[in-house]
């Protein structure tokens, strides 16, 4: 099953959001999205890390392969199902992204994700959100 994709992001559960955020910003990543229970830091080349607070419920720790278009999300899912893998349903999100989650044979969660060009700040390398350090 050859699919054009790239490793786009990794999502990590963190206990101290501010401490984790400062660590990754000090490494040179930029803050491109921030919400109450998660944030997204990104290299200028587009790869990023989603930092998830203990209260974040939408998704847990995982890594994501970014595919080239919306049709590939369905194509990859169908190919995986045909090979006997279990996959969650495809979700079309209000921001134009589409994805599904699954586990590899070792139980690691992964996401197959399409992000349209010009979408959320997490996928366009937007300017960082100003932070106040204490």
Where are each of the predicted segments found?
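Residue-level structural signal for beta-strand termini and adjacent loop
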Residues: 37, 54, 113-115
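N-terminal beta-strand motif that seeds the catalytic metal site of vicinal oxygen chelate
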Residues: 1-18, 63, 118-134
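Vicinal oxygen chelate
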Residues: 7-14, 55-79, 83-134
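Core segments of cupin and vicinal oxygen chelate
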Residues: 4, 11-49
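Solvent-exposed strand-loop boundary residues in beta-sheet-rich modules
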Residues: 45, 55, 116-118
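Short acidic/glycine-enriched loop/turn segments that link adjacent beta-strands
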Residues: 35-38, 58-59, 94-98
């Amino acid at each position: 099953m050859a699919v054009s994709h790239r490793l786009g992001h990794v999502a990590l559960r963190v206990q101290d959001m501010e401490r984790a955020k400062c660590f990754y910003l000090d490494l040179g990543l930029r803050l491109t999205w921030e919400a109450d229970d998660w944030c997204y830091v990104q290299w200028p080349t587009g790869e990023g890390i989603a930092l998830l607070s203990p209260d974040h419920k939408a998704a847990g720790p995982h890594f994501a392969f970014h595919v080239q278009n919306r049709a590939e999300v369905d194509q990859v899912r169908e190919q995986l199902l045909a090979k006997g893998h279990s996959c969650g349903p495809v979700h079309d999100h209000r921001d134009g992204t589409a994805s599904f989650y699954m586990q590899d044979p070792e139980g690691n969660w992964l996401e197959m994700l399409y992000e349209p060009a010009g979408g959320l700040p997490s996928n366009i390398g937007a300017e960082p959100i100003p932070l106040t350090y204490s």
